[in-house]
A protein has these predicted regions:
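Active-site-adjacent loops and short helices of periplasmic peptidoglycan-processing enzymes
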Residues: 1-102, 111-114
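Domain-terminus/edge residues, biased toward the C-terminal soluble/receptor-binding domains
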Residues: 81-82, 96-98, 102-275
């Protein structure tokens, strides 16, 4: 969808909200833009906004909300995520809605390619202005590692998303960038605000102990030469002190996967073989 596409809130978009569910109070009949709905979803974790995004984008594509959810599952598998199944757009508990840290990290890695995502999540405060179709709504970024001056601020963090349900407990996905190294950290089933220092410690460990090594120019095998012809086609994170030449490659190609995911699996195989 386009950022200025209208998002209309039907009864289905709001009727499921229960006391304690994250919401900014959008109501049936409200009309905002897709951009405003994304800000409400990504900053304030507004469950009704997340539902409305799926319902309206699905409708505009000639389908419905359930079709949009199914596309989420399709896209996850395209990225190499094989241990997830999404049953809704907001993450509220459903026995058929599950994921894992690895799949969330794959999605987080993909988000680095979408600057519009970072424009939204790096916003600290946002207001949906009052209009004929909606009351004024003000909300803020819940990811405390993105707040300069805050006790949990992490200067290398560039984006992310918080999450909580009584079943899943606290979850957090965070993207960080230091120099030319980009990392994604996923922490799940954590209690309270421990999720922020836990994430920071994991990032600090990774930045301190691993280095980004391009595969192109280092891999000399003719079997993968064509795949790695593009110098930007891939890299591997190596423990500092380990040379690329120390690795022993094992190539396994799954033809059902897209080329990007195939390359990722090949690179991971090199590291795992060495370890």
């Amino acid at each position: 969808g386009k950022m200025d596409d209208p998002v209309i809130f039907t009864k289905d978009c709001v009727s499921f909200i229960q006391p304690g569910d994250s919401s900014i109070g959008l109501k049936k009949g409200n009309k905002i833009t897709l951009e405003q709905a994304l800000y409400a979803t990504l900053l304030a974790s507004a469950n009704e906004a997340a539902y409305a995004v799926g319902a309206n984008v699905g409708k505009n594509a000639g389908h419905d909300y359930n079709w949009f959810v199914q596309q989420m599952n399709v896209r996850c598998k395209e990225l190499g995520g094989n241990n997830s199944h999404f049953a809704n757009t907001n993450g509220l508990h459903d026995p058929n809605h599950y994921t894992c840290a690895r799949d969330m990290a794959l999605i987080g890695r993909e988000l680095f390619k979408h600057p519009e995502f970072f424009k939204i999540v790096q916003t600290l405060n946002y207001t949906i202005p009052k209009s004929k179709t909606v009351e004024k709504h003000e909300f803020y970024q819940k990811h405390k590692m993105l707040w300069p001056g805050g006790s949990y601020y992490y200067k290398y963090a560039v984006g992310g998303k918080t999450g909580f349900t009584s079943d899943a407990l606290a979850t957090l996905i965070t993207m960080a960038k230091k120099g030319d190294t980009k990392l994604v950290c996923v922490v799940m089933r954590t209690h309270g605000r421990n999720i922020f220092p836990d994430t920071r410690h994991l990032f600090d460990y990774a930045f301190k102990n691993f280095k980004k090594t391009p595969v192109s120019g280092n891999e000399t095998s003719k079997d993968v030469g064509e795949i790695l012809a593009d110098e930007n086609s891939g890299y591997v994170m190596l423990p500092k002190g380990v040379k690329f030449s120390d690795l022993k490659m094992k190539m396994e190609v799954d033809k059902s996967m897209p080329s990007e995911a195939i390359l990722t699996e090949a690179i991971l195989s090199e590291v795992q073989e060495r370890s």
